[in-house]
Amino acid sequence: MDPVSNYADYMELINEGYEQSGMAKPFKDQALIEEWRADAGKNPLKYPNTNWLEETFKSSVAHNHVISMNGGSEKIKFYSSFGYQNNPGVMENTGFEKYNARLNVSADVKKWLNLAAQVSGYVSNMDPAAKYQSEGSTVSDVFKFASATTPGMVFRAPDGRYGAMNNSEDSSQSANNNPLLRLNSVDGNIHKTNVRSRFIATLKPFKGFTLTGSYSYEFVDEERSSKPVFLEGWDFRNEIVTFTNKKKSSIMNYDGKIDRFFNDVVARYETRLINDALGINAMLGASQEKYRSHNFKATKYDMIDTSLGVLNGAIGDASASGSSAEWAMRSFFGRVNLDWQQKYLLEINLRADQSSRFLKSKRTGYFPSASFAWRLEQEKFMEGLRDKGLSTLKLRLSYGSLGNNAVGNYDALALYANKNDDGAFNYSLNNLVALGLAQARIANPNLTWESTYMTNVGIDFGLFNNRLTGTMDYFHKKTKDILINLPAPAVHGIASIPKQNSAEVLNQGVELTLGWQDKIGDFSYSVNGNFTYVKNEVTKYKGKDKGGITYSGANIIWEGHAINSQYLLRCDRIIQTDEDLALVQQMIDNAPVVDGKKVDPFAAFGTPQKGDLLYKDINQDGIIDMDDREIVSDGPNPKFQFGLNLNASYKGIDFAMLLQGQAGAKIYWQNDLANTPSVRHGYQLNKEVADGRWYEGRTDATYPRLLEYQDQRNKQMSDFYLENLAYLKIRNIQLGYTLPAKLTKKISLERLRFYGSLENFFTFTSFRGFDPEIGGNIDYPAMKNVVFGINLSF
């Protein structure tokens, strides 16, 4: 997305759109437009032509350092590491700094007893604009405010002053939307501490039997503080301040803590019987987890001095809020592995999970699974193929189920509230105001586990001493009792009904992997690829007729179709010629007659003119309206995913490249900043739209004519705004060199390697947004990184 940065062009384009919607031109001073154009960038402070993308994003240098040590004796071993990370971010005031450490210790106290401890943690600090919504200075808000500016605004002068409007005819709301000013209008810090510890005892009282018990604890503490930074926005043509953010100031403090406890006991037994022909590997265990969180937030207004970073530095009203939550999980599980001569493999699993998120009668879910594999390459009748290069040939069959309890901690319970959108539920009693409560959500005692049942049939193969390897799998994955919101009958009043286990979704497809590895002298290389195809279908919802459709904008959930399919009008063409316009008149002439009167076929969206979109009459009733919508795409979930991993080494030189992509995914994306032929006074306009728009005399336009943003004629939900999310990314290219050992030993090093890499540098896609992986979100895309590093081993 590249915005129009020539301000003279921008003003004329805005005028064009408003006039074509029958509205007055916002920029009436034609002399100023010509004055701006004539300057041609000679005086960038007085006559700016700003590209907000270039001004907002910057290159930065990030650091990541890790030192690790390991050692010990025959009975005691340790590993420790220390790390430091510093990333200043690609936007101002969005930096991140992190210190981390790890210590693992393992001790053989007795021949039958091992004790181990693993402790890790980090301390991080984040600049406030990376997260806070105070003063509109979050990263995501940067895009929102940057879109609501114009190229006629200086973002920041060389002397550090921020720009506002340089043209009084610009929209006044643009004056306070300078994204650089927004990023720097908040001060504070986000400080986070995380400590994880795990203590393990392993007993081996007799051969083949192992008993392991562990206890884990994680502690997270996040402290946030924010206060405003008062800044001014300047009109550099007249050298006056036209904007200041000195509104009602506030200071905020937040503290949130999380405690997570986990403990488990697992017994394992392994043996071989009947002359080692029968192998038995059994496991039985239990685990328990508890999560607890609480937070507190306080805000106070009217700061005496913004340099005072404490709540008592403000003298106005104060507000405070807090919340807490907890959930727990208990599991019992077992597994038995059997093999006969390591040719026939059988595995049986059973687990029972209990979740505190469900009521007692629905708390436990049982999830069994089993798999069988047959190693054909070990059969005698395969000797001929083994002689011809067959190394591995395994057939696999499995069936199993898993549970999902990803619901709110208290969704099974009734919810009471003291207010709703219409106000508080207080009432008068004896001339006094009493606090009132009303039921906001009905309880659902039947809420229970969402279950996924999966069948898999596969084959593994290897040829030529496993230089060529591959797998082929067919999977059938059905998720039942999916939690959805169903409409509430009017008898429930204002109370909403809870989520219910009412839907089923089927995913089925194939997964393929293929790899080749070889060595020719000092040259080694490998090529590994993967491919996945998935078909998605809602198999149970609210019925197959249109009354069972749930709408979410352009996306729908409809039984018998892919989840989040796009349900849209189909665009026939952009009306650009007299022949195109004749089709409009033909529909008017042939319109149906109802009660003796000819129906206006375009009443729903307006009669299209040259430069407008013409939609298709899908149901052939002679009328263009919302009844002409149909499913035009299976939605944003990709049908195809693929990847390729290349590795090569020659003596001390090593090379690696990772490619990844997807296809068969589409989104409905209509964004005035990116791909809509709409103009709005004080807002940006995409250059691609401006260059591709229709205007009188043009017959090869790729976008409709410009219209004022509230004019909906060319903004109906249609497949014109359906974007393909297919892409191929070269995720990483790395080249390294390891010095010969004879050189590193001279400087007391065991190994010394230099490397450089390019990360997220190459993306091939037709998607017009920032990044097909984040779809239509105008948010922080994946950054391109150039990395240089050194690996040292002593």
Model-derived regions, located:
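Extracytoplasmic gating/loop element in the C-terminal half of outer-membrane beta-barrel translocons
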Residues: 38-43, 53, 233-236, 355, ...
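Residues embedded in well-ordered regular secondary structure
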Residues: 1-93, 130-133, 161-170, 181-186, ...
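Glycine-rich, aromatic-lined ligand/substrate-binding cores of catalytic
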Residues: 635-668
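Conserved small-residue
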Residues: 1-46, 297, 411, 519-634
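Extracellular/periplasmic, surface-exposed regions of secreted and cell-surface proteins
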Residues: 63, 98, 104-113, 118-123, ...
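Asp/Glu-centered strand-loop micro-motifs enriched in Gly/Pro and often flanked by an aromatic residue
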Residues: 53-57, 181-190, 320-322, 620, ...
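A generic structural motif
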Residues: 86-90, 354-356, 518, 636-638, ...
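Transmembrane beta-barrel wall of Gram-negative outer-membrane proteins
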Residues: 54-129, 140, 145-150, 193-198
